[in-house]
């Protein structure tokens, strides 16, 4: 069985729009094909739900109240990204400290 990994169009859009949901879920779809039969099995797609929407031509005129909502969501997005990076840095710092301690005790 041949396995072909590709990024589906829906997941490519979600990957460009989502912030922290990409760290725990895979964005690739897998399609299977067999050499014995001429027809291909349907592609199985595993995706995550995102809160990102596709911009449309009708949303080009933004009122001041909606721009404040977008500004708040952008602030919230970057705040959550900063918290995630801070958590990752803390874990890495603890791991390095543990490895240094093991190295000192080993010597």
Curated annotation (Swiss-Prot):
Keyword Cell membrane: yes
UniProt feature, compositional bias: Basic and acidic residues: 1-12
UniProt keyword Phosphoprotein present: no
Biased segments, Low complexity type: 13-65
One Gene Ontology cellular component annotation held by this UniProt entry: plasma membrane
Record's bilayer topology term: Single-pass membrane protein
Annotated GO biological process: negative regulation of cell population proliferation; shoot system development
Pfam families: DVL
Keyword annotations of the record: Cell membrane, Developmental protein, Membrane, Transmembrane, Transmembrane helix
Localization of this protein: Cell membrane
Described function: Small polypeptide acting as a regulatory molecule which coordinates cellular responses required for differentiation, growth and development, probably by restricting polar cell proliferation in lateral organs and coordinating socket cell recruitment and differentiation at trichome sites.
Membership in a protein family: Belongs to the DVL/RTFL small polypeptides family.
Name this protein carries in UniProt: Small polypeptide DEVIL 9
């Amino acid at each position: 069985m041949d396995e072909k990994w590709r990024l589906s169009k829906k997941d490519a859009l979600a990957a460009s729009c989502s912030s922290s949901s990409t760290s725990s879920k895979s964005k690739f779809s897998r399609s299977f094909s067999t050499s014995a039969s001429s027809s291909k099995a349907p592609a199985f797609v595993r995706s995550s739900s995102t809160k990102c929407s596709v911009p449309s031509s009708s949303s080009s005129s933004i009122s001041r109240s909606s721009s404040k909502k977008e500004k708040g969501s952008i602030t919230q997005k970057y705040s959550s990204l900063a918290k995630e990076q801070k958590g990752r840095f803390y874990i890495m710092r603890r791991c390095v400290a543990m490895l240094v301690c093991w190295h000192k005790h080993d010597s």
